[in-house]
């Protein structure tokens, strides 16, 4: 069964398994997400639900957003995202989706925005080796030639050059849910997750679960 929700990254810690192994985990606040809209094959061409996360002040929101969220009767939300589902009839407008939809041992795909590191050179951005450090070298951290003059007389697209590093949408696949805290809507997910603390994440069933 397909499922997903919006979450917030709280940080990393570590837990210990029954056999004493230390497991690095990321703590994620998963929901609660409120169902705002249902989409079906008949009306939209596909089955999906639209959910909202983190309530905000209606007085500081546009009328279109307030009207859209009004049907759920749960206020206005800061983040609204859509998730494909197989059975739309399982959900009702206004339903709350929490961390309970996942269980320990499940595998999820996590999408977030990586930490922005600003304008960086080719060594940090792409892992270039660089030139000699001494003995008359004038080439230390420069990228080197980016194209000949006679041919191709231009710089090819996607050439690895200095530029913005990070601050882009990243998806990490097949991360395991180690522990679920239904009381506080927390998920402990094995390994690292893209983004800074308090960053917004999308959690979905892993496409590589099997």
UniProtKB/Swiss-Prot annotation:
Pfam families, sorted: Ribosomal_L3 (PF00297)
Signal peptide, first to last residue: none
Keywords: Ribonucleoprotein, Ribosomal protein, RNA-binding, rRNA-binding
Biological processes annotated in GO: translation
Family: Belongs to the universal ribosomal protein uL3 family.
Cited function: One of the primary rRNA binding proteins, it binds directly near the 3'-end of the 23S rRNA, where it nucleates assembly of the 50S subunit.
Name of the protein in its database record: Large ribosomal subunit protein uL3
């Amino acid at each position: 069964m397909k499922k997903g929700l919006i979450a917030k990254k709280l940080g990393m810690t570590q837990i210990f398994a029954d056999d004493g192994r230390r497991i690095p985990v990321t703590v994620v606040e998963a929901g609660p997400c409120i169902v705002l809209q249902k989409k079906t094959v008949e009306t939209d061409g596909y089955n999906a639900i639209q959910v909202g996360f983190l309530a905000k002040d209606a007085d500081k929101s546009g009328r279109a957003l307030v009207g859209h969220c009004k049907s759920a009767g749960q206020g206005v939300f800061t983040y609204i995202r859509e998730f494909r589902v197989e059975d739309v009839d399982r959900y009702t407008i206004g339903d709350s989706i929490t961390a309970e939809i996942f269980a320990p041992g499940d595998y999820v795909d996590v999408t977030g925005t990586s930490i922005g590191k600003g304008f960086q050179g080719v060594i940090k951005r792409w892992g270039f080796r660089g030139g000699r450090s001494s003995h008359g070298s004038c080439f230390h951290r420069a990228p080197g030639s980016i194209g000949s003059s006679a041919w191709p007389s231009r710089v090819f697209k996607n050439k690895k050059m200095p530029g913005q590093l990070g601050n882009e949408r990243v998806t990490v696949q097949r991360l395991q849910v180690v522990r679920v805290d239904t009381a506080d809507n927390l998920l402990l997910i094995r390994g690292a997750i893209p983004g800074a603390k308090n960053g917004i994440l999308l959690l979905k069933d892993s496409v590589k679960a099997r």
